[in-house]
């Protein structure tokens, strides 16, 4: 018997997450590790669970994630985006709730590039009048 699974791809900053939802108990596995082990910050783990809170499907699906690129914050945002997209495959009626919460929109903010002659993207060396 083939197991039902739903997939979605999420992106944030330089992170890309490939998410699979399988009907289960709510266990989240990121890169073959438990989410508590992989992401040490509790607030970022809450970010990951936001789509389930909005759609009231907490504990209904096991989440298997492959994520690469970026840091903890970018990866958490990418996982959230991927879960939201996968939940659309579960039930297209979730679209309005997820859209209202802003979970389907790809966050387009990226790190601004460093400019020549400056120390960082916008930080210049101290100005001396004389």
Curated annotation (Swiss-Prot):
Belongs to the universal ribosomal protein uS9 family. This is Small ribosomal subunit protein uS9. PROSITE patterns: RIBOSOMAL_S9. InterPro entries: Ribosomal_Su5_D2-typ_SF (IPR020568), Ribosomal_uS9 (IPR000754), Ribosomal_uS9_bac/plastid (IPR023035), Ribosomal_uS9_CS (IPR020574), Ribsml_uS5_D2-typ_fold_subgr (IPR014721). NCBIfam families: PRK00132.1 (NF001099). GO terms for cellular component: cytosolic small ribosomal subunit. It comes from Enterococcus faecalis (strain ATCC 700802 / V583). The keyword Ribosomal protein applies. One of its GO terms (biological process) is translation. Keywords: Ribonucleoprotein, Ribosomal protein. The keyword Ribonucleoprotein applies. Coiled coil: none annotated. Pfam families: Ribosomal_S9 (PF00380). One of its GO terms (molecular function) is RNA binding.
């Amino acid at each position: 018997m083939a197991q039902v699974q739903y997939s979605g791809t999420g992106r944030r900053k330089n992170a890309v997450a490939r998410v699979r939802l399988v009907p289960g108990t709510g266990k989240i596995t990121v890169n073959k590790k438990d989410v508590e082990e992989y992401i040490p910050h509790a607030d970022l783990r809450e970010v990951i669970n936001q789509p389930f809170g909005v759609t009231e499907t907490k504990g209904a699906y096991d989440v298997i994630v492959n994520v690469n690129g970026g840091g903890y914050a970018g990866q958490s945002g990418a996982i959230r985006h991927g879960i939201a997209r996968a939940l659309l495959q579960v039930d297209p009626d979730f679209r309005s709730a997820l859209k209202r919460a802003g979970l389907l929109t790809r966050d387009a903010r990226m790190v601004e590039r460093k400019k020549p002659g400056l120390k960082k993207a916008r930080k210049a060396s101290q100005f001396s009048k004389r």
